[in-house]
Amino acid sequence: MENIDFGILFQGIGTMIESGWFLACARVFLILLGFLLIYLGWKGILEPMVMIPMGLGMIAINCGTLIMPDGNLGNLFLDPMLSDTDELMNTMQIDFLQPVYTLTFSNGLIACFVFMGIGTLLDVGFLLQKPFASLFLALCGELGTFLTLPIANALGLSAQESASVAMVGGADGPMVLFTSLALAKHLFVPITVVAYLYLGLTYGGYPYLVKLLIPKRLRSIKMTVKKAPKNYDAKVKLAFAAVLCAVLCFLFPVASPLFFSLFLGVAVRESGMKHIYDFVSGPLLYGSTFMLGLLLGVLCDAHLLLDPKILKLLILGMLALLLSGIGGILGGYIMYYIKKGNYNPVIGLSLIHI
C-alpha cells in the first residue's frame, strides 16, 4: 500500500509545519485573535457586525493555507496583491471572494456605500444649531492625525505613508481605507486592517480613558438648556447638505466620492424618499459593513501582515487613536470653561467621528 502523505492530505496542518516557526506562530496568533474577536463581538463589547465576520475570516484564512500549483503557499479566498490583468481575471474565476474584493473593496466602493448609509443617519440640524462647538470639537478630535504625521515621517515612513497611517487618528474606517488606497496602495491592506482592529478595540478602551482623565463630578454634569433649540425644516437641511457637498468637493476633490456619498445619504433622509431611505439605511449600510468586516478578516493572512513596517503601523495607529481621544477630551474641557461649567467634557470624545 502506498504511503499516505498526511501533510498533503491535510494541507492546513502540513503548511503550518513546513512554513517555519515564525510564520506558524503568526498564523496561530491570528487564529486565536479571530476567536477573541468573535467572542468580544458576541458579548457586545465590540461591534458584532464587523468583528464577528472579521474574526471568522481571520480564522479561515490562516487555517486554510494550502500549496498552490506554482508551489507557493496561498488560499482560495482572494489575493490582494494581484496587478496583472490576465492573472486577475483568472483568479476571479477561482477565489470566491476575489470578485467582491476587486470590484468593491480595492476601488473604495464599499467605503462609499458605508458613507451613504451613515448619511441617512446623520441629522445636520445639530451642525446648523451649534456650528462652532461641532467644528471645534471635531478639530480637537483630529489631534492624533496632526501629531502622528510628523512622528511617522521621523520613523522613516514616506510622506504618503505617514499621511495614510495618521488618518487612523480620525477614527473613521472608510476614510482610512480610501486615503491609503490613494496615497500608499502598497500598504493599504495592513493600514486598513490595523485601523479597523484598533477602532473596534478603541470603543472598548475609550470609557477607561474617560474615567482616567475626567473626574466623576464632571462626568455627571447635567447640562441645562437656556433656550429651546431651533428646529430646521427638511428643505433647509437639504439645501445645507447640497452647499456643503459642493464646497467640500471643490476644496478636496480627491475625497469627493466620499463627500458625495455622505451627502447623498443626507439628501435621501431629508427628501422623504421612504423606500430608498429604508434600503440605504438598512440593507445597503448593514450589508456593506458586514462584507467589509468579512473582507478585512480574510486580508489578515499571516503572509501579508509580516511586513517589516507592520510594527511601526501598529504603534502609530495606537498612538494616533490615543492622541485623538485625549484631544477630544481636551476640547471638552475647553468647552466646559467657555460655557462656565454648563458643559459635560465627555461630549468632546463623542465628536471624534465628525
Task: Please give the residue ranges for each predicted region.
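N-terminal alpha-helical transmembrane segments of multi-pass membrane transport
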Residues: 1-78, 92
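Structural signature of hydrophobic alpha-helical transmembrane segments
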Residues: 21-30, 99-114, 162-167, 254-262, ...
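Entry/N-cap segments of selected transmembrane alpha helices
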Residues: 24, 124-149, 303-329
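Membrane-core helix-loop-helix motifs of multi-pass transport proteins
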Residues: 127-143, 147, 159-205
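Juxtamembrane and boundary regions of transmembrane helices in multi-pass small-molecule transporters
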Residues: 150-159, 191-223, 330-340
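Membrane-embedded hairpin module used as a gating/binding unit in multi-pass transport
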Residues: 196-273
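Transmembrane helical segments that form the transport core of multi-pass membrane transport proteins
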Residues: 244-332
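Conserved small/polar residues in nucleotide/adenosyl-binding loops
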Residues: 352-354
